[in-house]
Every structure is written in C-alpha cells, then in structure tokens.
Amino acid sequence: ITKDALNEYLTIEDKGFYPDYDRFLLYLLLYGCVFRKVYYDSITKKPISRFIIPEDFLVDNNCSSILESNRLTHIRYLSKREILLNMQDGTFRSVALDYLKSTNNIVDTEENDLKEDDVNSGIDISAYSTLSRFKFYETHEYLDLNEFFDSGDTWELDSNSLPSPYVITRCGLSNKIVSIIPNWQEDDPTRTRINCFVHYNLFPGFDI
C-alpha cells in the first residue's frame, strides 16, 4: 500500500518528477550508470525522488554496488533560502556561514577585505556574491562517535563502540558540519543503514 501511494504521488502530484525523469533517461544513455535518490524533503514536507548527476555522487573504490560501499556522498547545491529554512526547522544546526550575510554586507566586506580575520581565514567572501547555490556534502557512512571523545587509555568492545550509520552534512566552502543524523531504524538492533539511493545500470562494466 505504501509503495502504491508513493508511486501515485510521484507520478501524479509531483510536478517535477517527469521533467527530472527525462533528464535521468538522457544521462543513463550517455553514462550507462546513474543514481536516483528517494527521500523526505524537510522543506516541502513531501517525499521526493530525484536523479543525481554522476559527478555529484561519490562512492568507495573497489565496491561492486552502492550497498557494499562504506561511504556514500551526495554533493548537493542549496540556495540561501534552502539553507536558512533547514536551519529554522532544525534540520541544520545554526552555524555562522559568511555567505548567509546580505548582499550589502558582502559588498562592504569586499571593500574592507584587509581585515585581519578575513586574511587569516583565507576565504574571499566577495566571491559569494556571484553564487546562487552553495555546495554541501551529504555523506552516508558508518561512524563510531565515541572516537571523538576522550575515553582515556581503557577501551572495551561493546554495542556502542561499533560504527553505526549516520548522515553527515557539511558546508563545502567553510567545511563546517551542519548536521549529523542517525540513519537506522530505532528498533533495529543491528543498526542497518537505511538506503535512499537507487543504482541504475544500462551496460555492465568493470566498475560501479
């Protein structure tokens, strides 16, 4: 029932599904191998199924399928509005990103770009004024978050020390992490990764 309802929504109510599907078929013919992402969009509050350009999807080397890859990275391009909406609804944490400043503030910074903090950071904020979308890396990987905390010299193997699947999103320009989300069912004792990517192969090849 859930699959039928999702299929009906995507093919009837989602106006962007078929234009996106046309691009998907074109890239499949050109590349022979493409990916699609099915997920819940926190901004529209609706399920979304969208094609991913091959250059924007990264997997581990020497894996035969995406299900066997320990790390999957989707390069996303978000507008200023999408970033702020994600921060407002709690999807992203509120972090200081220079390009979220107003255009006037960016111009003022350009005129006074000799400020010590800007020079030391090595970031040219004036370049942001020409960008309409900003790169974010959404990485699906297994992590042991206990490794980020100092537990002393003692270490014992338990269920909490095993790497678990998380979705980590970081800003491509500032390298700041904006989101870390658990990616398994709450009642799943094995903590199996929830996969939202679909791999399509037109021609068999030596690599994924």
Which residue ranges define each predicted feature?
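Extended alpha-helical, oligomerization-prone segments that build pores/tubes and scaffolds
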Residues: I1-I208
